[in-house]
Amino acid sequence: MDKRHDPSRRIIAPHGTQLSCKSWLTEAPMRMLMNNLHPDVAERPEDLVVYGGIGRAARDWDCYDKIIEVLQRLEDDETLLVQSGKPVGVFRTHADAPRVLIANSNLVPHWANWEHFNELDKLGLAMYGQMTAGSWIYIGTQGIVQGTYETFVSVAKQHFEGISKGKWILTGGLGGMGGAQTLAGTMAGFSVLACEVDETRIDFRLRTRYVDKKATSLDEALAMIEAANQAGKPVSVGLLANAADVFAELVKRGVTPDVVTDQTSAHDPLNGYLPQGWTMAEAAAMRKTDEAGVVKAAKASMAVQVQAMLDLQTAGAATLDYGNNIRQMAFEMGVENAFDFPGFVPAYIRPLFCEGIGPFRWVALSGDPEDIYKTDAKVKELIPDNPHLHNWLDMARERIAFQGLPARICWVGLKDRARLALAFNEMVKNGELSAPVVIGRDHLDSGSVASPNRETESMLDGSDAVSDWPLLNALLNTASGATWVSLHHGGGVGMGFSQHSGVVIVCDGTDAAAKRVGRVLWNDPATGVMRHADAGYEIAKNCAKEQGLDLPMQE
Protein backbone atom coordinates (compact mmCIF):
# COMPACT_ATOMS: atom_id res chain seq x y z
CA MET A 1 0.00 0.00 0.00
CA ASP A 2 1.37 3.40 -1.05
CA LYS A 3 1.09 5.78 1.91
CA ARG A 4 1.23 8.67 -0.55
CA HIS A 5 -1.99 7.69 -2.35
CA ASP A 6 -5.44 8.34 -0.89
CA PRO A 7 -8.23 9.12 -3.37
CA SER A 8 -10.63 9.84 -0.50
CA ARG A 9 -8.75 13.02 0.46
CA ARG A 10 -10.20 16.36 -0.62
CA ILE A 11 -8.25 19.23 0.91
CA ILE A 12 -9.68 22.76 1.00
CA ALA A 13 -7.96 25.49 3.01
CA PRO A 14 -10.14 27.34 5.53
CA HIS A 15 -11.42 30.77 4.51
CA GLY A 16 -12.35 33.73 6.67
CA THR A 17 -10.92 34.98 9.94
CA GLN A 18 -11.55 32.09 12.32
CA LEU A 19 -8.23 30.53 13.32
CA SER A 20 -7.47 26.82 13.56
CA CYS A 21 -3.97 27.61 14.86
CA LYS A 22 -2.72 29.81 17.69
CA SER A 23 -1.91 32.82 15.48
CA TRP A 24 -1.81 33.93 11.86
CA LEU A 25 1.91 33.11 11.81
CA THR A 26 1.04 29.41 12.01
CA GLU A 27 -2.40 29.60 10.39
CA ALA A 28 -0.75 30.94 7.23
CA PRO A 29 1.59 27.99 6.54
CA MET A 30 -1.25 25.59 7.40
CA ARG A 31 -3.63 27.24 4.92
CA MET A 32 -0.97 27.47 2.24
CA LEU A 33 0.01 23.80 2.61
CA MET A 34 -3.66 22.89 2.30
CA ASN A 35 -4.08 25.26 -0.64
CA ASN A 36 -1.26 23.51 -2.49
CA LEU A 37 -3.45 20.39 -2.41
CA HIS A 38 -6.72 22.05 -3.38
CA PRO A 39 -8.30 20.04 -6.24
CA ASP A 40 -8.25 23.13 -8.48
CA VAL A 41 -4.58 23.78 -7.68
CA ALA A 42 -2.70 20.47 -7.51
CA GLU A 43 -2.08 18.19 -10.48
CA ARG A 44 -2.69 14.95 -8.53
CA PRO A 45 -3.84 15.93 -5.03
CA GLU A 46 -4.72 12.35 -4.10
CA ASP A 47 -0.98 11.56 -4.43
CA LEU A 48 0.14 14.81 -2.76
CA VAL A 49 1.58 15.83 -6.16
CA VAL A 50 1.25 19.55 -6.77
CA TYR A 51 3.06 20.03 -10.10
CA GLY A 52 6.22 19.26 -12.05
CA GLY A 53 6.22 15.47 -12.39
CA ILE A 54 6.33 14.34 -8.74
CA GLY A 55 6.66 17.68 -6.92
CA ARG A 56 4.92 17.01 -3.61
CA ALA A 57 3.65 19.10 -0.69
CA ALA A 58 4.30 16.41 1.96
CA ARG A 59 6.10 13.06 1.98
CA ASP A 60 3.00 10.97 2.62
CA TRP A 61 -0.45 11.41 4.13
CA ASP A 62 0.73 10.52 7.64
CA CYS A 63 3.33 13.29 7.39
CA TYR A 64 0.73 15.70 6.03
CA ASP A 65 -1.61 15.00 8.94
CA LYS A 66 1.19 15.40 11.46
CA ILE A 67 2.33 18.71 9.92
CA ILE A 68 -1.21 20.08 10.24
CA GLU A 69 -1.45 18.80 13.83
CA VAL A 70 1.87 20.41 14.80
CA LEU A 71 1.05 23.75 13.16
CA GLN A 72 -2.20 23.87 15.11
CA ARG A 73 -0.35 23.54 18.42
CA LEU A 74 2.82 25.48 17.53
CA GLU A 75 3.59 28.48 19.73
CA ASP A 76 4.83 31.82 18.41
CA ASP A 77 8.29 31.22 19.82
CA GLU A 78 8.68 27.74 18.30
CA THR A 79 9.94 26.54 14.92
CA LEU A 80 8.91 23.38 13.09
CA LEU A 81 11.59 21.64 11.03
CA VAL A 82 10.44 19.76 7.92
CA GLN A 83 12.86 17.33 6.23
CA SER A 84 11.76 16.33 2.72
CA GLY A 85 8.09 16.65 3.55
CA LYS A 86 8.34 15.03 7.01
CA PRO A 87 7.95 16.99 10.27
CA VAL A 88 11.01 15.97 12.27
CA GLY A 89 11.28 18.41 15.16
CA VAL A 90 9.91 21.42 17.02
CA PHE A 91 12.38 23.72 18.75
CA ARG A 92 12.16 26.80 20.93
CA THR A 93 13.43 29.84 19.00
CA HIS A 94 11.95 33.35 19.29
CA ALA A 95 9.07 35.44 17.99
CA ASP A 96 10.97 36.86 15.01
CA ALA A 97 12.35 33.48 13.89
CA PRO A 98 10.61 31.54 11.11
CA ARG A 99 7.76 29.35 12.28
CA VAL A 100 8.75 26.68 9.73
CA LEU A 101 12.11 25.77 8.19
CA ILE A 102 12.00 23.35 5.25
CA ALA A 103 14.70 21.34 3.45
CA ASN A 104 13.59 19.24 0.48
CA SER A 105 15.40 16.63 -1.65
CA ASN A 106 18.90 17.86 -0.81
CA LEU A 107 21.60 15.28 -1.55
CA VAL A 108 25.39 15.24 -1.18
CA PRO A 109 26.61 16.21 -4.68
CA HIS A 110 28.20 12.85 -5.60
CA TRP A 111 24.82 11.16 -5.06
CA ALA A 112 22.69 13.99 -6.44
CA ASN A 113 21.09 12.12 -9.33
CA TRP A 114 17.67 10.69 -10.15
CA GLU A 115 18.77 7.08 -9.69
CA HIS A 116 19.82 7.61 -6.07
CA PHE A 117 16.90 9.89 -5.32
CA ASN A 118 14.38 7.40 -6.71
CA GLU A 119 15.78 4.68 -4.44
CA LEU A 120 15.39 6.96 -1.42
CA ASP A 121 11.92 7.92 -2.60
CA LYS A 122 10.86 4.25 -2.76
CA LEU A 123 12.16 3.72 0.77
CA GLY A 124 10.14 6.68 2.03
CA LEU A 125 13.29 8.63 2.93
CA ALA A 126 12.98 11.58 0.56
CA MET A 127 10.48 13.76 -1.25
CA TYR A 128 10.87 15.82 -4.42
CA GLY A 129 9.72 19.31 -3.52
CA GLN A 130 10.07 20.93 -6.95
CA MET A 131 10.16 24.65 -6.13
CA THR A 132 6.87 25.89 -4.67
CA ALA A 133 5.24 22.46 -4.15
CA GLY A 134 7.25 21.49 -1.10
CA SER A 135 7.57 25.07 0.12
CA TRP A 136 3.80 25.65 0.26
CA ILE A 137 3.50 28.74 -1.92
CA TYR A 138 2.20 27.35 -5.22
CA ILE A 139 -0.72 29.44 -6.50
CA GLY A 140 -1.69 27.40 -9.53
CA THR A 141 -0.63 28.14 -13.06
CA GLN A 142 -0.90 31.91 -12.49
CA GLY A 143 2.38 31.62 -10.60
CA ILE A 144 4.38 31.48 -13.81
CA VAL A 145 2.04 33.32 -16.20
CA GLN A 146 3.62 36.74 -15.85
CA GLY A 147 7.17 35.47 -16.15
CA THR A 148 6.17 33.61 -19.30
CA TYR A 149 4.33 36.70 -20.56
CA GLU A 150 7.40 38.88 -19.93
CA THR A 151 9.53 36.36 -21.82
CA PHE A 152 7.20 36.29 -24.83
CA VAL A 153 7.00 40.10 -24.88
CA SER A 154 10.82 40.17 -24.93
CA VAL A 155 10.84 37.60 -27.75
CA ALA A 156 8.56 39.87 -29.78
CA LYS A 157 10.78 42.88 -29.13
CA GLN A 158 14.01 41.08 -30.00
CA HIS A 159 12.86 39.13 -33.04
CA PHE A 160 9.76 40.82 -34.48
CA GLU A 161 10.19 44.54 -33.74
CA GLY A 162 7.63 44.21 -30.97
CA ILE A 163 4.92 42.89 -33.28
CA SER A 164 3.37 39.55 -32.29
CA LYS A 165 0.11 39.86 -34.22
CA GLY A 166 -0.25 37.08 -36.79
CA LYS A 167 2.59 35.06 -35.27
CA TRP A 168 2.48 31.77 -33.40
CA ILE A 169 4.35 29.75 -30.80
CA LEU A 170 4.88 25.99 -30.84
CA THR A 171 5.41 24.35 -27.47
CA GLY A 172 4.81 21.21 -25.44
CA GLY A 173 3.33 20.56 -22.00
CA LEU A 174 0.15 21.80 -20.32
CA GLY A 175 0.90 20.79 -16.73
CA GLY A 176 1.09 23.09 -13.73
CA MET A 177 3.93 25.14 -15.22
CA GLY A 178 3.51 24.50 -18.94
CA GLY A 179 -0.16 25.42 -18.71
CA ALA A 180 0.86 29.06 -18.36
CA GLN A 181 2.28 29.21 -21.87
CA THR A 182 -1.03 29.31 -23.73
CA LEU A 183 -2.52 32.17 -21.73
CA ALA A 184 0.75 34.09 -21.50
CA GLY A 185 1.27 33.72 -25.24
CA THR A 186 -2.15 35.08 -26.19
CA MET A 187 -1.77 37.88 -23.63
CA ALA A 188 1.44 38.82 -25.46
CA GLY A 189 -0.40 38.72 -28.80
CA PHE A 190 0.80 35.35 -30.13
CA SER A 191 -1.28 32.33 -31.07
CA VAL A 192 -0.05 29.19 -29.31
CA LEU A 193 -0.09 25.52 -30.29
CA ALA A 194 0.67 23.40 -27.21
CA CYS A 195 1.12 19.62 -27.43
CA GLU A 196 -0.07 17.57 -24.45
CA VAL A 197 -0.38 13.78 -24.06
CA ASP A 198 -2.82 13.91 -21.12
CA GLU A 199 -6.29 14.91 -22.28
CA THR A 200 -7.41 15.67 -18.72
CA ARG A 201 -4.79 18.42 -18.56
CA ILE A 202 -6.09 20.01 -21.76
CA ASP A 203 -9.64 19.84 -20.40
CA PHE A 204 -8.51 21.41 -17.11
CA ARG A 205 -6.82 24.29 -18.94
CA LEU A 206 -9.98 24.78 -21.02
CA ARG A 207 -12.08 24.88 -17.87
CA THR A 208 -9.82 27.46 -16.21
CA ARG A 209 -9.57 29.53 -19.43
CA TYR A 210 -5.86 29.00 -19.96
CA VAL A 211 -6.56 27.28 -23.31
CA ASP A 212 -9.12 28.45 -25.88
CA LYS A 213 -9.58 25.33 -28.02
CA LYS A 214 -8.79 21.61 -28.13
CA ALA A 215 -7.63 19.70 -31.20
CA THR A 216 -7.09 15.98 -31.72
CA SER A 217 -5.07 16.18 -34.94
CA LEU A 218 -2.20 18.35 -36.13
CA ASP A 219 -4.12 19.38 -39.25
CA GLU A 220 -7.04 20.56 -37.13
CA ALA A 221 -4.73 22.50 -34.80
CA LEU A 222 -2.84 24.18 -37.65
CA ALA A 223 -6.14 25.19 -39.26
CA MET A 224 -7.22 26.83 -36.00
CA ILE A 225 -3.93 28.71 -35.77
CA GLU A 226 -4.10 29.81 -39.41
CA ALA A 227 -7.69 31.05 -39.07
CA ALA A 228 -6.84 33.03 -35.96
CA ASN A 229 -3.78 34.59 -37.53
CA GLN A 230 -5.75 35.54 -40.64
CA ALA A 231 -8.33 37.20 -38.40
CA GLY A 232 -5.63 38.96 -36.41
CA LYS A 233 -6.96 37.54 -33.14
CA PRO A 234 -4.64 35.22 -31.18
CA VAL A 235 -5.87 31.79 -30.14
CA SER A 236 -4.42 29.04 -27.96
CA VAL A 237 -4.88 25.42 -28.97
CA GLY A 238 -4.24 22.35 -26.83
CA LEU A 239 -3.32 19.51 -29.19
CA LEU A 240 -3.68 15.96 -27.87
CA ALA A 241 -0.38 14.59 -29.16
CA ASN A 242 3.20 13.79 -28.23
CA ALA A 243 5.43 16.86 -28.60
CA ALA A 244 8.29 14.85 -30.12
CA ASP A 245 5.96 13.53 -32.83
CA VAL A 246 4.52 16.94 -33.64
CA PHE A 247 7.80 18.86 -33.65
CA ALA A 248 9.40 16.31 -35.98
CA GLU A 249 6.32 16.25 -38.25
CA LEU A 250 6.42 20.03 -38.67
CA VAL A 251 10.05 19.79 -39.76
CA LYS A 252 9.07 17.08 -42.25
CA ARG A 253 6.24 19.23 -43.63
CA GLY A 254 8.38 22.35 -43.83
CA VAL A 255 6.03 24.25 -41.53
CA THR A 256 7.98 26.73 -39.41
CA PRO A 257 6.44 28.40 -36.35
CA ASP A 258 7.59 31.89 -35.43
CA VAL A 259 8.66 30.80 -31.94
CA VAL A 260 9.53 27.34 -30.59
CA THR A 261 9.95 26.28 -26.97
CA ASP A 262 8.90 23.48 -24.60
CA GLN A 263 7.64 23.00 -21.05
CA THR A 264 7.09 19.28 -20.79
CA SER A 265 8.38 17.74 -17.54
CA ALA A 266 11.58 16.70 -19.30
CA HIS A 267 13.53 17.33 -16.09
CA ASP A 268 12.21 13.97 -14.83
CA PRO A 269 12.55 11.34 -17.58
CA LEU A 270 11.05 8.60 -15.41
CA ASN A 271 7.86 10.33 -14.30
CA GLY A 272 7.50 13.44 -16.43
CA TYR A 273 7.89 12.67 -20.14
CA LEU A 274 5.93 10.14 -22.21
CA PRO A 275 8.07 8.32 -24.82
CA GLN A 276 6.92 8.36 -28.43
CA GLY A 277 4.47 5.61 -29.28
CA TRP A 278 3.61 4.86 -25.64
CA THR A 279 0.25 5.28 -23.97
CA MET A 280 0.05 6.76 -20.50
CA ALA A 281 -1.15 3.41 -19.14
CA GLU A 282 1.82 1.61 -20.70
CA ALA A 283 4.23 4.12 -19.18
CA ALA A 284 2.62 3.78 -15.73
CA ALA A 285 2.96 -0.01 -15.89
CA MET A 286 6.55 0.12 -17.16
CA ARG A 287 7.60 2.47 -14.36
CA LYS A 288 6.86 -0.36 -11.94
CA THR A 289 8.84 -3.02 -13.81
CA ASP A 290 11.54 -1.32 -15.90
CA GLU A 291 12.53 2.15 -14.71
CA ALA A 292 15.75 2.17 -16.74
CA GLY A 293 13.84 1.28 -19.89
CA VAL A 294 11.37 4.11 -19.34
CA VAL A 295 14.16 6.63 -18.79
CA LYS A 296 16.03 5.49 -21.90
CA ALA A 297 12.92 5.66 -24.09
CA ALA A 298 11.91 9.06 -22.72
CA LYS A 299 15.36 10.55 -23.29
CA ALA A 300 15.45 9.11 -26.82
CA SER A 301 12.18 10.91 -27.57
CA MET A 302 13.56 14.10 -26.04
CA ALA A 303 16.50 13.82 -28.42
CA VAL A 304 14.06 13.65 -31.34
CA GLN A 305 12.21 16.70 -30.05
CA VAL A 306 15.36 18.76 -29.47
CA GLN A 307 16.72 17.85 -32.90
CA ALA A 308 13.45 19.10 -34.36
CA MET A 309 13.78 22.31 -32.33
CA LEU A 310 17.27 22.80 -33.76
CA ASP A 311 15.97 22.17 -37.28
CA LEU A 312 13.15 24.67 -36.77
CA GLN A 313 15.69 27.19 -35.47
CA THR A 314 17.73 26.70 -38.65
CA ALA A 315 14.53 27.27 -40.64
CA GLY A 316 14.08 30.65 -38.95
CA ALA A 317 12.10 30.07 -35.75
CA ALA A 318 13.10 31.97 -32.62
CA THR A 319 13.90 28.95 -30.45
CA LEU A 320 14.43 28.93 -26.68
CA ASP A 321 14.73 26.46 -23.83
CA TYR A 322 12.17 27.23 -21.12
CA GLY A 323 14.07 25.72 -18.24
CA ASN A 324 13.05 22.06 -18.14
CA ASN A 325 16.54 20.68 -18.94
CA ILE A 326 15.44 19.08 -22.20
CA ARG A 327 18.67 20.21 -23.90
CA GLN A 328 20.75 18.35 -21.31
CA MET A 329 18.72 15.16 -21.77
CA ALA A 330 19.13 15.34 -25.55
CA PHE A 331 22.84 16.08 -25.20
CA GLU A 332 23.24 12.93 -23.10
CA MET A 333 21.58 10.99 -25.93
CA GLY A 334 24.06 12.22 -28.52
CA VAL A 335 22.59 15.51 -29.78
CA GLU A 336 25.94 17.28 -29.53
CA ASN A 337 24.66 20.74 -30.48
CA ALA A 338 21.64 20.61 -28.16
CA PHE A 339 22.72 23.84 -26.48
CA ASP A 340 22.79 25.79 -29.74
CA PHE A 341 19.53 27.47 -28.80
CA PRO A 342 19.59 29.59 -25.63
CA GLY A 343 17.81 29.32 -22.32
CA PHE A 344 15.14 31.93 -21.66
CA VAL A 345 16.92 33.56 -18.71
CA PRO A 346 20.17 34.65 -20.40
CA ALA A 347 18.30 35.47 -23.60
CA TYR A 348 15.41 37.49 -22.19
CA ILE A 349 15.13 37.75 -18.38
CA ARG A 350 18.57 38.43 -16.87
CA PRO A 351 18.43 42.24 -17.14
CA LEU A 352 15.38 42.11 -14.87
CA PHE A 353 17.22 39.91 -12.36
CA CYS A 354 20.05 42.45 -12.26
CA GLU A 355 17.63 44.94 -10.70
CA GLY A 356 16.11 42.40 -8.32
CA ILE A 357 12.96 42.22 -10.44
CA GLY A 358 11.21 38.89 -10.11
CA PRO A 359 8.03 36.96 -9.29
CA PHE A 360 6.54 38.75 -6.28
CA ARG A 361 3.29 36.97 -5.32
CA TRP A 362 0.69 37.31 -2.61
CA VAL A 363 -2.32 35.32 -1.42
CA ALA A 364 -5.49 36.44 0.38
CA LEU A 365 -5.83 34.12 3.37
CA SER A 366 -9.44 35.30 3.71
CA GLY A 367 -10.39 33.51 0.51
CA ASP A 368 -12.11 36.72 -0.62
CA PRO A 369 -11.24 37.86 -4.18
CA GLU A 370 -12.02 41.45 -3.17
CA ASP A 371 -8.87 41.46 -1.04
CA ILE A 372 -6.82 40.77 -4.17
CA TYR A 373 -8.63 43.44 -6.18
CA LYS A 374 -7.91 45.98 -3.43
CA THR A 375 -4.22 45.07 -3.43
CA ASP A 376 -4.16 45.32 -7.24
CA ALA A 377 -5.39 48.90 -6.88
CA LYS A 378 -2.77 49.60 -4.21
CA VAL A 379 0.01 48.38 -6.53
CA LYS A 380 -1.20 50.77 -9.24
CA GLU A 381 -1.38 53.62 -6.72
CA LEU A 382 2.16 53.07 -5.43
CA ILE A 383 3.69 52.42 -8.87
CA PRO A 384 1.78 54.94 -11.01
CA ASP A 385 4.32 55.33 -13.81
CA ASN A 386 4.53 51.74 -15.06
CA PRO A 387 1.86 51.21 -17.76
CA HIS A 388 3.28 47.77 -18.60
CA LEU A 389 2.65 46.62 -15.01
CA HIS A 390 -0.81 48.22 -14.96
CA ASN A 391 -1.67 46.45 -18.21
CA TRP A 392 -0.55 43.14 -16.69
CA LEU A 393 -2.75 43.66 -13.61
CA ASP A 394 -5.75 44.55 -15.79
CA MET A 395 -5.24 41.48 -17.98
CA ALA A 396 -4.73 39.27 -14.94
CA ARG A 397 -7.99 40.40 -13.37
CA GLU A 398 -9.89 39.91 -16.63
CA ARG A 399 -8.38 36.64 -17.82
CA ILE A 400 -6.87 34.67 -14.93
CA ALA A 401 -9.17 32.41 -12.94
CA PHE A 402 -8.21 32.06 -9.30
CA GLN A 403 -7.26 28.53 -8.26
CA GLY A 404 -7.84 27.85 -4.57
CA LEU A 405 -7.17 30.87 -2.37
CA PRO A 406 -7.21 34.09 -4.45
CA ALA A 407 -3.71 35.18 -5.39
CA ARG A 408 -1.82 37.58 -7.59
CA ILE A 409 1.65 37.72 -9.07
CA CYS A 410 3.46 40.69 -10.52
CA TRP A 411 7.13 41.11 -11.28
CA VAL A 412 8.56 43.99 -9.25
CA GLY A 413 12.07 44.77 -8.10
CA LEU A 414 14.22 45.74 -5.16
CA LYS A 415 12.88 49.24 -4.75
CA ASP A 416 9.22 48.19 -4.77
CA ARG A 417 8.80 44.81 -3.03
CA ALA A 418 9.19 46.04 0.56
CA ARG A 419 7.15 49.17 -0.18
CA LEU A 420 4.22 47.15 -1.49
CA ALA A 421 4.43 44.62 1.33
CA LEU A 422 4.40 47.33 3.99
CA ALA A 423 1.37 48.88 2.32
CA PHE A 424 -0.43 45.52 2.34
CA ASN A 425 0.38 45.11 6.03
CA GLU A 426 -1.08 48.55 6.70
CA MET A 427 -4.23 47.58 4.77
CA VAL A 428 -4.64 44.58 7.07
CA LYS A 429 -4.04 46.78 10.12
CA ASN A 430 -6.67 49.36 9.18
CA GLY A 431 -9.27 46.81 8.08
CA GLU A 432 -9.17 47.49 4.33
CA LEU A 433 -8.38 43.80 3.87
CA SER A 434 -10.58 41.27 5.61
CA ALA A 435 -7.69 39.03 6.75
CA PRO A 436 -3.89 38.82 6.53
CA VAL A 437 -2.06 38.12 3.28
CA VAL A 438 1.04 36.05 2.71
CA ILE A 439 3.78 37.24 0.38
CA GLY A 440 6.17 34.84 -1.30
CA ARG A 441 7.79 34.11 -4.63
CA ASP A 442 8.93 31.38 -6.95
CA HIS A 443 12.40 29.97 -6.28
CA LEU A 444 13.10 31.16 -9.82
CA ASP A 445 14.25 34.60 -8.75
CA SER A 446 17.18 36.93 -8.88
CA GLY A 447 19.26 35.72 -5.94
CA SER A 448 17.69 32.48 -4.79
CA VAL A 449 18.85 29.86 -7.28
CA ALA A 450 21.89 28.21 -8.80
CA SER A 451 20.92 26.36 -11.97
CA PRO A 452 23.52 26.29 -14.76
CA ASN A 453 21.01 25.15 -17.39
CA ARG A 454 18.40 27.73 -16.44
CA GLU A 455 18.57 30.76 -14.11
CA THR A 456 22.37 30.95 -13.91
CA GLU A 457 23.17 29.79 -17.43
CA SER A 458 26.05 31.67 -19.08
CA MET A 459 26.84 33.98 -16.17
CA LEU A 460 29.24 36.73 -17.12
CA ASP A 461 32.01 35.51 -14.82
CA GLY A 462 31.48 31.76 -15.34
CA SER A 463 29.96 31.24 -11.88
CA ASP A 464 26.96 29.30 -13.23
CA ALA A 465 27.33 26.32 -10.85
CA VAL A 466 28.25 28.19 -7.66
CA SER A 467 25.45 27.41 -5.21
CA ASP A 468 26.64 29.49 -2.25
CA TRP A 469 24.19 32.18 -3.35
CA PRO A 470 20.87 30.39 -2.65
CA LEU A 471 22.32 29.15 0.65
CA LEU A 472 23.18 32.71 1.66
CA ASN A 473 19.74 33.84 0.52
CA ALA A 474 18.02 31.25 2.75
CA LEU A 475 20.24 32.09 5.71
CA LEU A 476 19.62 35.83 5.35
CA ASN A 477 15.85 35.39 5.02
CA THR A 478 15.89 33.26 8.16
CA ALA A 479 17.89 35.90 10.03
CA SER A 480 15.60 38.64 8.71
CA GLY A 481 12.45 37.09 10.17
CA ALA A 482 10.59 35.37 7.34
CA THR A 483 7.62 33.26 8.40
CA TRP A 484 8.87 30.19 6.57
CA VAL A 485 12.03 29.52 4.59
CA SER A 486 12.88 26.57 2.36
CA LEU A 487 16.01 25.16 0.74
CA HIS A 488 15.54 22.70 -2.12
CA HIS A 489 17.53 20.73 -4.68
CA GLY A 490 16.57 19.72 -8.21
CA GLY A 491 13.60 21.96 -8.89
CA GLY A 492 12.80 22.85 -12.48
CA VAL A 493 15.69 21.01 -14.10
CA GLY A 494 15.93 17.84 -12.03
CA MET A 495 18.32 16.13 -9.65
CA GLY A 496 21.90 17.31 -9.74
CA PHE A 497 21.20 20.45 -11.74
CA SER A 498 19.93 23.08 -9.28
CA GLN A 499 19.79 24.35 -5.71
CA HIS A 500 17.33 27.03 -4.69
CA SER A 501 15.60 28.69 -1.77
CA GLY A 502 12.13 30.01 -1.04
CA VAL A 503 10.68 32.56 1.35
CA VAL A 504 7.20 33.46 2.59
CA ILE A 505 6.17 36.15 5.05
CA VAL A 506 2.84 36.98 6.67
CA CYS A 507 1.40 40.49 6.71
CA ASP A 508 -0.90 40.28 9.73
CA GLY A 509 -1.23 44.01 10.33
CA THR A 510 0.95 44.15 13.43
CA ASP A 511 3.87 46.49 14.00
CA ALA A 512 6.10 43.46 14.53
CA ALA A 513 5.11 42.15 11.10
CA ALA A 514 5.92 45.51 9.54
CA LYS A 515 9.47 45.30 10.89
CA ARG A 516 9.93 41.75 9.63
CA VAL A 517 8.39 42.56 6.25
CA GLY A 518 10.63 45.59 5.82
CA ARG A 519 13.73 43.49 6.43
CA VAL A 520 12.77 40.39 4.45
CA LEU A 521 11.31 42.07 1.38
CA TRP A 522 14.34 44.34 1.08
CA ASN A 523 17.04 41.79 1.81
CA ASP A 524 15.62 39.00 -0.34
CA PRO A 525 15.73 40.82 -3.72
CA ALA A 526 18.89 42.67 -2.63
CA THR A 527 20.74 39.34 -2.59
CA GLY A 528 19.89 39.02 -6.28
CA VAL A 529 21.33 42.42 -7.09
CA MET A 530 24.39 41.46 -5.01
CA ARG A 531 24.82 38.15 -6.83
CA HIS A 532 24.64 39.75 -10.29
CA ALA A 533 26.86 42.69 -9.32
CA ASP A 534 29.42 40.19 -8.04
CA ALA A 535 29.27 38.44 -11.42
CA GLY A 536 30.12 41.71 -13.16
CA TYR A 537 26.79 42.92 -14.57
CA GLU A 538 26.85 46.71 -14.90
CA ILE A 539 23.06 46.99 -14.53
CA ALA A 540 23.32 45.26 -11.15
CA LYS A 541 26.31 47.36 -10.07
CA ASN A 542 24.41 50.53 -10.90
CA CYS A 543 21.29 49.30 -9.12
CA ALA A 544 23.33 48.45 -6.02
CA LYS A 545 24.84 51.92 -6.02
CA GLU A 546 21.50 53.67 -6.57
CA GLN A 547 19.82 51.69 -3.78
CA GLY A 548 22.71 52.09 -1.34
CA LEU A 549 23.59 48.42 -0.96
CA ASP A 550 26.70 47.77 1.12
CA LEU A 551 28.73 45.45 -1.12
CA PRO A 552 32.34 45.60 0.18
CA MET A 553 34.06 44.29 -2.96
CA GLN A 554 32.15 46.72 -5.20
CA GLU A 555 33.56 49.82 -3.49
UniProtKB/Swiss-Prot annotation:
TM region(s), chain numbering: none
Cofactor note: Binds 1 NAD(+) per subunit.
Alphabetized PROSITE patterns for the sequence: UROCANASE
The protein's annotated pathway: Amino-acid degradation; L-histidine degradation into L-glutamate; N-formimidoyl-L-glutamate from L-histidine: step 2/3
Keyword presence, NAD: yes
Subcellular location: Cytoplasm
Sites where the protein binds NAD(+): 52-53, 130, 176-178, 196, 201, 242-243, 263-267, 273-274, 322, 492
Keyword annotations of the record: Cytoplasm, Histidine metabolism, Lyase, NAD
Keyword Cytoplasm set for record: yes
Database matches in InterPro entries: Urocanase (IPR055351), Urocanase-like (IPR023637), Urocanase_C (IPR035401), Urocanase_central_sf (IPR038364), Urocanase_CS (IPR023636), Urocanase_N (IPR035400), Urocanase_Rossmann-like (IPR035085), Urocanase_sf (IPR036190)
PANTHER family: UROCANATE HYDRATASE
Family indicated by similarity: Belongs to the urocanase family.
The name this protein goes by in its record: Urocanate hydratase
Gene name, Swiss-Prot/TrEMBL: hutU
